[in-house]
């Protein structure tokens, strides 16, 4: 093969890889409650959303990565319930106890169905922090414990986002929004 042909193939492969990296499907991975895990049962059946068929996403379940059907939720995050509520916030919560729900679709407008002291009720969502979580690579080492230090962005200090890692969800410095756009542009320029 000529060097020009080899270079062209390499650039095409890199372009396809970069495009695959940025593919994220709509919807969310279903909630998962961690139980004791036998690490011998760990499986990596997908690497990212692009490796899953149709609308399925690559979701972490314990130490395994599986293609799963997503849950459809409204934008934003449920607010974190605090024990130090002001009287006006407490009054608002009591009013909301009359508006129970099962899913986001049961709430009017932009409100989300969130856990509260009176069950599932409708709340106005908290916005996710800007930026993009880094891609998850590898699997959690056998000797390292697997756990979440956060569930949502609003539980992370400063600009950090709550992102998946090989060993659970952690507060992480995100890539800026422009990072994804500049990667797409460089891929197009390379082709």
Swiss-Prot record:
Residues 22-71, 72-125, 126-175 form the WAP domain. Milk-specific; major protein component of milk whey. Residues 1-18 form the signal peptide. GO terms for molecular function: serine-type endopeptidase inhibitor activity. It is found in: Secreted. It comes from the Eukaryota. GO terms for cellular component: extracellular space. Disulfide bonds join 29-59, 42-63, 46-58, 52-67, 78-114, 97-118, 101-113, 107-122, 133-163, 140-167, 150-162, 156-171. Keywords: Disulfide bond, Glycoprotein, Milk protein, Protease inhibitor, Repeat, Secreted, Signal. Could be a protease inhibitor. This is Whey acidic protein. The gene is WAP.
């Amino acid at each position: 093969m000529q060097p020009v042909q080899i270079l062209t193939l390499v650039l095409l492969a890199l372009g396809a890889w970069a495009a695959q990296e940025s593919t994220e499907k709509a919807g969310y991975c279903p909630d998962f409650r961690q139980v004791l895990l036998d690490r011998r049962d760990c499986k990596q059946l997908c690497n990212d959303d692009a490796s899953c068929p149709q609308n399925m996403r690559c979701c972490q379940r314990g130490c395994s990565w599986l293609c799963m059907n997503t849950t459809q939720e409204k934008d934003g995050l449920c607010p974190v319930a605090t024990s130090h509520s002001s009287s006006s916030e407490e009054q608002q919560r009591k009013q909301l106890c009359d508006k129970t729900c099962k899913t986001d679709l049961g709430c009017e407008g932009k409100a989300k169905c969130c856990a509260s002291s009176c069950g599932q009720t409708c709340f106005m969502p908290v916005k996710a922090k800007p930026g993009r979580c880094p891609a998850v690579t590898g699997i959690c080492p056998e000797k390292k414990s697997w756990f979440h230090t956060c569930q949502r962005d609003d539980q992370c200090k400063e600009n950090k986002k709550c992102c998946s890692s090989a060993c659970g969800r952690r507060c992480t410095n995100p890539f800026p929004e422009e990072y994804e756009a500049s990667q797409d542009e460089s891929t197009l320029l390379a082709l």
